[in-house]
C-alpha cells in the first residue's frame, strides 16, 4: 500500500516541520480503489509496530510503517461518518506495549466562546484552557497542552512522555487565536515538559509554559504536569467573613515575610522550610505578635533566588523551593483556619530576560514591546509587558484571579506601580516614546490597572489590592467609576520617607524638622493609605531600622520604640518587615534572615513585645483603625510645639467609641506636668507607654492614668497633666 501523501510531505512530518500536522495525521477521508475510505495516519518515532483497534468490535488492524522515522498508516474500508472510536496499540523500541490514541483525532478544548473571549482579552479563566490541562476523551486519559505563540512556525510538546523528542507531538493551531494545542494520551501528573518552538526564521528553542502550575527546583527549568484541583479546603468560614468585611474600617497589622529566609531548617536545601512547616510556625508567631495578615514577597516561580521573587517566569506556579502547589494551598488554608489573612506581592510591571521565559517567546516581541524605549526597564534590566495587547492583559488579569480562585489569596500588593504609570520612568530625554497625546502617562498601563482592579473586586468581594506607588498620581485608591485606579490601599511612601528622615536626626535638631512629621496629615486622607516599613527600607546599604536611629545604645532602642508607636497611632493600615520587630542590627540578607539570636537580650525582646502590644492596642481600640482613611478619625491637639519636639493628637472611632489621646516626645528630655487639652472630662487611662519597663524603657509614665482638671487648654474645654517619657509615646483612652 502506498500512502496518498508524498514522500516529501511524510519527510516533513518526520522532521517536525509541518505547522498543522492535524491536517495530515489522524483520520482523513480518501478514495481507495475507487470507493470512499478512511486513512488513519500516526507518527510515533519511538514505535517498532502499531495496530489500530476498534473500541466497539475489538478488531485489531496492523498499520504499515511507511517511513523509518515512525510514520504509520492504515486504510479502513468504511468512510468517516462519526467520531472515531479507534485506539492504538504499539510496541516501542524497548519492547514495551502501550495502548493510546492519536492526538489528532481529539476535538479541541476551545469552544467558540473561549475563542471569542480570548480574542477580546477577557477570558478570566484562561488558566483552565491554556497550559497543561488534565483531560479524559472517550475514556482515554491524558493532558491537553495549549500555548499562545501566534508568530511561531511550529510548536512541539516535549517531555518525559516522549523522551523529549517532539517530532511526533506537533501542536495544532487553534483557529483565529494564535494558540497551539495538542492532546497527549497517557501523559500524566508528575511528568516534566516544555514547549519546543520554531520561530519564523527556523530557529528552535525550548520555552517554559507561561501557564504552568508547577516547575522544577531552580536552576532546573522544566515544568511539571500538576493537578491543582484535588486539595480539600477547610476555610469556608474565613471566606464568608472576608466577603462581608469592610476593609475601610478593619484593623490591619501586616507582617511582611520572605519565606526563604524568615526561618531556616537544618538539612534543607539552602535551609528552606516547606510551606506546611512555615504555615504552622507563622500562625503561632502571628498569634503571639497579634499580626492580622502576612504579606509574602513574591512566591511565583523565579529562576534567580537573589531577585527575591520579583523576576518571575512562572506566574501561575508557586515556587518549588518550599514544596508543591498543594503544599502552598495548605499554607493558605492553615493561615485562614487560624484567622490570619494572606497577601502576596504581585509583579505585573516587568519580567526577566531568561531564555526559557517570556522574552521573545515565539521569536517575536510577544509579551513585551519591540522597541527598547518601551520594552526594557533601565533600572532592573528586565522586560516591560505590552499592556496595550489584549492577550497580554488577559494573561496578567487571569493570573491575578488565578491566585484568588485556586489559592484563596486575600489580597494582591502590586509592585512598582509608579514604573507602570509613566513612560519616562527612570529615563532621560530621548529614551522614551510619548503617548498618543504627546504625554508621559502610560495610557495602556492605566487601563490595565483599572481593569485588573475591577476584575478582582467584582469576582472576589473582600479581597484587597494595594499599590506600591511612590508619586503623587491622584486617585490611586479611588474607585474606577470616580476616575481612580481602583486599588483598595496605596502605600504611603511619602510618610515613610519623611518619618525616617526625621527620626535619623539627632533629637537636638528635630525642632527644625517638625514639618516632616506634620506634613503627612495634610494629605493623609486623600488616599486609603498603608504605612509601610517594608524590606525596601532595610536593604542596599540603608542598614536596619535600629541602626538608622541616632544616639547611644539606650537612645537607639528608645527611638525605635518611639518610631513604631508613632506609626501605629498614625492614620493608615500598618506593615512591618520581618526582623524589624526584634530590632535586628544588620540589614536584611535573603541568605541569612532575621537575627533571632538577639532575642536572648532583654532590649530586643522588649521591642518584640512592644510591637505585639501595639498590634493588640490597634485591634482592641476602634479609634485606632475605624477612621484610618477619613479626617473624622483624627484631630490635632498640639502640632506646633516644635521647640520641645512634641506632637499630641486625638484618634476617634465610630460614634460611641472612646477617643484615644496620643502624646509623642521626640527628645530624650522627660517632661512632667505637661498640660494637654482634651475634648471631654473624665479619667484618661494610660493603655500604652513605649517607655515601659517591659519594653526596655525607664518606666516613666502616667499609670494608671490622668483625671481632667477643669482647665481649658489647647482650645479644648478641659485638660490633663501628663508625664511625657523620654523618646517615648504614651497612649490614653477616655474611660468615663
From Swiss-Prot:
GO terms for molecular function: 1,4-alpha-glucan branching enzyme activity; cation binding; hydrolase activity, hydrolyzing O-glycosyl compounds. GO terms for cellular component: cytoplasm; cytosol. Catalyzes the formation of the alpha-1,6-glucosidic linkages in glycogen by scission of a 1,4-alpha-linked oligosaccharide from growing alpha-1,4-glucan chains and the subsequent attachment of the oligosaccharide to the alpha-1,6 position. Its EC number is 2.4.1.18. InterPro entries: A-amylase/branching_C (IPR006048), Branching_enzy (IPR037439), GlgB (IPR006407), GlgB_N (IPR054169), GlgB_N_E_set_prok (IPR044143), Glyco_hydro_13_cat_dom (IPR006047), Glyco_hydro_13_N (IPR004193), Glyco_hydro_b (IPR013780). GO terms for biological process: glycogen biosynthetic process. Pathway: Glycan biosynthesis; glycogen biosynthesis. Belongs to the glycosyl hydrolase 13 family. GlgB subfamily. This is 1,4-alpha-glucan branching enzyme GlgB.
